[in-house]
Amino acid sequence: MPSINENEDIINKLKMSTITDDIIIQPSIDDLPYEEDVSKNPYSVNCWLRYLEFKQGSPQKQRNYIYERAIRELPRSYKIWHQYLLERTLAIRGKCILENSFEAVNTLFERSLVFLDKMPRIWIEYCEFLMIQEKITLTRKTFDRALIALPVTQHYRIWNEYTKFILKRSIPSLTCIRVYKRYLKIQPEKVEEYIEYLIKIKEWQEVVNQLIKLLDNVKFKSIKGKSRHDHWLQLCEILSSYPKQITGVDVDSVIRSGIGKFSDQIGKLWCYLSDYYIQLAQFEKARDIFEEALTSVGTARDFSFIWESYTQFEDSLIAAKQEILEEDPSEDNLLEFDIIIERYENLIQRQPLLLNSVMLKQNPNNVQEWLKRVNLYSNPTPNVKMIIQTFTDSIKSIDPQLAKGKLSTIYSTFAHFYEQNNKLSQARLIFENSLTVNFKTIDDLSTLYCDYAEMELKHRNYEKAIEILKRGTVSPKKQNTIIEENEPVQKRLFKSIKIWTFYVDLEESFGTFHNTKSIYEKMIQLKVVTPQIILNFAKYLEENKYFEDMFKAYEHGVQLFLFPHVQDIWITYLTKFIQRYAGMKLERTRDLFEQVLSKVPPKESIIFYLMYANFEEQYGLARHSMAVYDRAAKSVDKEDRFKMYLLYIHRASEFFGVNQTREIFSKAIEQLPDQYVRDMCLKFADMEKKYGEIDRARSIYIHGSQFSDPRTSMFYWNTWSDFEKLHGNEDTFKEMLRIRRSVQASYITQNPTLALLNKLNNKDDKDDKNQQQKQQQQQQEKQQQQQQQQQQASTLTKSKPVTVSLPETIQYNKKIENDDEINLDDDEEEEEEEDQLAIKAFPKTLLKII
């Protein structure tokens, strides 16, 4: 701050400059009106401004003279002063800053501030003008004077320019720090900008001090959107990177407190702490920090982060030691190098175990990680002590209800470990202890019982194995006892199919028939069976010649299960029953078929109908067989009915002839879905045609036409057309064409989209005309050969020759006896040009008849 004496010197200097610049300039004739105006109204700002506007193009000295007169009369006029200062600064723009004109403008600014010290715009422009002149000290003092003169509410305008000024490279850092500290007292939220500046000038001690203050202030809100977490990381990074430049801070405790607070950046913070000691060349301490970090982190991500830093640290030590060895290959240096290499190799070997420890710390109930740890101790050289310790720790640590994976695998592997080391008693003890654990699922406990029994089987203790499984299959005395899901697994174990299956397999192999049979019956009683178990039981009884018991087993199976699971049981049951009794027990067999047909869904019923019909054909009556086929055609799934009707018709024709098949054809056409009626009509008409029933066949074609769209069912209409050519006449052929047009029109009405597609496809039909023309030429060649054959045939007959009018492509004469012969003339083209049919020659058999 300037003293009182300095202010007096400035005022005296201003007075002397005013006297020096007070040059009298005579006004011109044009100036007289304005002179008269300002003389009459010397205190009017507008009068002076009008005068200055009139003198816009005059020399600067004349304008300066007018400005001086104006401010002498109106020393506190902001408009006049601001305009005067602006003109003076613009007038010297581009000149050397060492010229006296710059000092004159500085003096003018000082004169204005004597009267306008409360105007921040004047202060700002003055300071900006001083910054152009690179007068650092004077600029700083002027900013300070502005802060003293202006009220606090306007300080922000000064500080915005002040901070820009001090951030210049030419400003000493100590000055900047002092100014910024004053600034933070007014606006403490700008501390982040201050920290960025300190980082830029590498004042690390002050950076740490400001960050600590910032973190101590719980109410601080970042204007840059940073969180306390970000500031913590920034502080730890700076502390670890520049430990020699920072004093008075317990870096170890600061970083460790951050590790306790921010769990998502634990790995990075541990690396910062180790880097701190590395920068201080305390390598052993840094290594201890790394080891502590690897054993304390709880996530694989943090572990990998620390592991990378640790290995890079060891690599750098090895590289540095190699350089030392090249310069001084002494024994001490070589020994130290060997120690570093051995330590590094040991670290690499321990990596899987260290990572496994982290994973187990993250979830101690992870079964797979415990087993992985056992494998790590087993390879390459088994460490028996650590393997046993790992198994023991896993059993103590894992909560059976929270286990991730099959906990039974831990106990089984532990027991087999003792077994492989010829300690069978210890293995039995492990299994016995495991059988009392309250596992999460029955499958775990049943697996242990089975593994226990398998171990005894390996050592040929068959009775011991059976006794173990017998213990596991003990059921409640009361059959209807309800076991809740929250009961221990030991009380629910008798419901395990796995242990029962193993038990019955052992009894079949090493036990008696009656014991095995009783076990199967117990399983059926407890309903712990599958369809395959029922089939196995029945097969076992069959092998031992207990046929009625076998059928009882099948009966139990069909009562326990529903379709589709029971299908194999029913098929085997019926097959075995028919093989056993053939036709001796017809009614009982029929009852079985009726029983299964009353339960089977339509989609799966076809096989049983076929078995039933085949049985009736072999051992029953053909009439009964036809009744079964008739039921099947009505009851099977819609997709199977067409095949069923075809089989029905085939068998009926073999047993009863054509008359019976006509009735079946009629039923099929009535009951089949529309997509199958067309094919059935073709087969029906073909059958009638074979037996000479032409009118019946034509009626069938007419009936089936309503299900045949001419655009998609070309085969149907071609077949009918060929039929009419061979067996019809001109009227019937025209009737066929009429029906075809009618059906096509009805389908177009029902499905206009298909009609549109048909029009689009017509374009492709035009491309086929060339091929059709080639075919017509080939037909003409065949026509000539056919005419020669007909002429030869006409010489053999004495009947009246009849000329048949055909399309232009084919014409020939032939002799016929009936007057209903088809006479295809040009009328067909008049009715519909699109219905051009391929004309075939008359069969030789028909010529012989004629």
UniProtKB/Swiss-Prot annotation:
Record's GO cellular component, any one? nucleus
- Name where the HAT repeats lie: 25-57, 58-90, 100-132, 134-168, 171-203, 281-316, 477-509, 511-543, 545-579, 584-618, 692-726
The record's principal subcellular location, in a coarse class, is: nucleus
The source's superkingdom equals Eukaryota
Q: Where can this protein be found?
A: Nucleus
Name the Pfam families for this protein: HAT_Syf1_CNRKL1_C, HAT_Syf1_CNRKL1_N, HAT_Syf1_M
Spans annotated as Disordered:
761-837
> Which residue intervals are annotated with compositional bias (Polar residues) in the record?
793-812
State any GO BP term from the record: DNA repair
Q: Which InterPro entries match?
A: HAT, HAT_Syf1-like_N, HAT_Syf1_central, HAT_Syf1_CNRKL1_C, Syf1-like, TPR-like_helical_dom_sf
Q: Where is the composition biased (Acidic residues)?
A: 818-836
Compositionally biased tracts (Basic and acidic residues): 761-771
Keyword terms of this UniProt record: DNA damage, DNA repair, mRNA processing, mRNA splicing, Nucleus, Repeat, Spliceosome, Transcription
Matching entries from SUPFAM superfamilies are given as: TPR-like
Residue spans of biased composition, Low complexity class = 772-792
Query: Whom does it interact with, and what assembly results?
Result: Identified in the spliceosome C complex.
Family, as annotated: Belongs to the crooked-neck family.
Task of the protein: Involved in pre-mRNA splicing as component of the spliceosome. Involved in transcription-coupled repair (TCR), transcription and pre-mRNA splicing.
Protein name from the UniProt record? Pre-mRNA-splicing factor SYF1
Q: What is the originating organism of this protein? A: Dictyostelium discoideum
Identify the gene encoding this protein.
xab2
